[in-house]
Regions:
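Conserved acidic residues
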Residues: 72, 105, 185
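N-terminal Rossmann-like dinucleotide-binding module
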Residues: 15-20, 24-88, 165, 179
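Beta-loop-alpha module in the N-terminal Rossmann-like domain of NAD(P)-dependent dehydrogenases
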Residues: 78, 89-149
């Protein structure tokens, strides 16, 4: 583990050095930067119906794109869906998953169904140095995630693996705010969801509380159609704190709520359910542009890895341990999170 951590840390330094040596623009001439051409992956259970509306010049935001990041090429296993998307948003359809090489500046996978095959879909782009956005939960197992992270490090290819909640102001300011409340006693949170993959709160709270989660538990009646859901992150004792639990549940009506209870006060955050798509998703797209324009990592590779280990452990708890806490280190690296839609690909798509 320490060797892998050092490898990933070195990769981050390499990317940072590359940016420093090849700065594409200063703040003063940022407006002169050409819009990045974005390759579109996945149009079924996908963010792209929302993202395109914000990014395309044909979107609803005053008839213009909101960022210098525009969808220009699209691939989907369903050719009709790809052509319908292209007609609506002014894109070019490619006939193979690797057909956007040499045509786009970045690729963004918006499709949940793609996740177990994401390491295959994105491999050509990672090897070619094309920045890639990974769809959550980022992989089906740790072995496949490590394949992508290793390629990112080897080829100095920026990757980003986040959920919208990680880009909200509460996530950005929370770590500083909790420094003023003394030793943490307990953490509670809720999020309005219909299925487990949309339960983004754990990643937001890890950004606030830290990534040194030791054990995870998950209880739910159904990951596909949630009636009840509870996920617990167990933080061990450390030099400057007592052990505590971050307990998160599915609940309405707010998009999310959380409270961190300390010895000397509390820190809370919330987003109302009425928040529109701009409020919910613009931060993600802005940070994608900011990171990929500069060819930097939004988060260190070992943070991406730890986030996946936490969700993998949550599923392992639910399906192998009846919801009991599971030490992250005890989950086999090749233990798979089941595909959202089994047999979404038959394998023929990945052969020349």
């Amino acid at each position: 583990m320490s060797n892998r951590r050092e490898f990933f840390r070195g990769a981050g330094a390499t990317l940072a050095a590359a940016w420093a040596a090849n700065s594409i623009a200063s703040e003063a001439d940022a407006a002169a930067i050409e819009p990045m051409k974005a390759g579109v992956f996945g149009l079924d259970y996908s963010f792209w119906s929302i993202w395109a509306d914000l990014l395309s010049p044909k979107g609803r935001r005053l008839g213009t794109s909101t960022l210098r990041l525009t969808p220009t090429h699209v691939w989907d296993k369903d050719s009709k869906k790809a052509h319908d998307f292209a007609a609506r948003w002014g894109c070019e359809v490619v006939d193979r998953y690797d057909g956007m090489l040499g045509k786009v500046d970045v690729v963004l996978n918006g499709e949940l169904n793609n996740v177990p095959w994401q390491h295959l879909l994105l491999r050509p782009y990672l090897e070619a140095g094309v920045p890639c956005f990974l769809q959550r939960p980022w992989s089906d197992n740790l072995v496949h995630l490590d394949e992508m992270l290793d390629l990112s490090a080897k080829h100095s290819t920026p990757v980003m693996a986040t959920v919208p909640f990680e880009h909200y102001s509460d996530a950005d300011t929370g770590a500083a705010r909790i420094k003023n409340i003394g030793e943490i006693q307990a953490v509670f949170g809720t999020a309005q969801i219909s299925d487990e993959p949309h339960f983004h709160l754990p990643y937001m709270l890890m950004k606030i509380l830290g990534y040194d989660v030791e054990s995870v538990s998950m209880s739910t009646d159904d990951v596909h159609k949630v009636g009840y859901l509870n996920v617990n992150h167990f933080y061990p004792r450390a030099a400057d704190r007592r052990p505590f639990v971050s307990s998160m549940s599915a609940a309405r009506p707010d998009a999310y709520t959380f409270t961190v209870m300390g010895e000397h006060g509390t820190v809370s955050g919330a987003m109302p359910a009425q928040a529109d798509n701009f409020a919910r998703f613009f931060g993600t797209l802005l940070d994608i542009q900011r990171s990929f324009e500069k060819r930097t990592l939004y988060q260190p590779l070992d943070v991406i890895r730890k986030k996946f280990q936490c969700v993998q452990a949550a599923y392992y708890s639910r399906f192998e341990r009846a919801g009991a806490p599971v030490k992250i280190a005890a989950v086999p690296a090749d233990w798979p999170i089941a595909a959202w839609t089994p047999n979404w690909y038959d394998g023929s798509e990945f052969h020349k």
